[in-house]
Amino acid sequence: MRKAKIRIILGDKLMIWYPYVQMKKMKTPYKIVDAEGVYLYTQDNKMIDSVSSWWCMIHGYKNKEINEAMKNQIEQFSHVMLGGLTHEPVLKLSEKLKDFLPGDLDYCFFSDSGSVAVEVALKMALQFNINRGSGRKKLLSLTSSYHGDTFMCMKAGDDEDYHFILSEDDKKDVIHIPTEMDALEKVFRTHGNEFYAFIVEPLLQGAGGMKMYSIDFLRRARELCNEYDVVFIFDEVATGFGRTGNRFVSDLVLPDIIVLGKALTAGYIGHAVTVANHKIYNGFYSDKDTDALMHGPTFMGNPVACSAALKSIEIFERENYMEKIKHIEDMVRNLVSGFTHPLIKEIRYMGGCLCFQVHDPSCLIGFQEYAYQRGVFSRPFLDIMYAMFPYIIQDNEIRQIVDVMKDWFTEQKGI
């Protein structure tokens, strides 16, 4: 009886362990009863999803074509293991990605989440070096980076606000540098022959603070990775499929391994992929069983997920999304041009992303509920208020989101 009463008071909080929150302090989450287009619906409200449900819902909700593709595949068969079996959707998606991605990024290893796909990329790079007799053990990454929440991803990241459980000993083989040329040159001169890989979120660092940096840094990093024979990994889980204003940053600078997730399936079902070039793949291709990549997620290459990804990519190409993303960026530029406030440290935007960084994170307390009352779902983090726009968003909806963000500051009392 006591447990039943607690459930009535707390609702689902008793049974669900939510992410990135101290459960004892957590406010009751908004309960979604429907979603369509760019809108989320609660029992008594309608709000624009300004963050694309953690940056993945590029086509919005209830896209009929994706729903139909998934339904058709479910009616045929919903899943088979990829060990010893294969199927048409995974073959088609692999072929499509081979054509869709730049250079010789041809070899697809599928996973069920972005974090796992990053783990696979790091494992590939490390074993690639082991297979060729190299004793390299160090990993190079960036400050303010985030690559996921599984163990190697936590080590690669530089995000103490998320992964404070790691000790210095846990990260002894990882070096983090800022996105500055001098730091890049120095670390390669000092440790270049010790690195098995350099992993980056290219151009846009997401959960580490929405930091943006120059393509010139990546171009020089590519040259140094070539010079020191270091595997260059692009974590494009968040940046891929147009988020930076480029289809992929890999179109501008070619990595050895690219990781895709989130928008790969447009958020309709979890799936991710690690794609390697010929050099990496050939480092495993031999007569030795011990050279094989010993990894195999249960749901890798799930046929329903592959069907969703194929349809999502088809829509992305057919609807000329790169023009849509350019329009979003141009409109955001006009809407924030000249806007300043003492609480705001910097306003940044790139492609389909807008970020207000504040001096003091406490000034964002209450913004989520404020936005909700104004018909916008937002979820600020650290010292960041941001939007990751769905690509189907209309001009009036962009304006509504940006106005809510700006008005929060202009309505602050005593500032």
What function would you assign to each model-found segment?
Residues R2-I415:
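Conserved N-terminal phosphate-binding loop of PLP-dependent enzymes in the Aspartate aminotransferase
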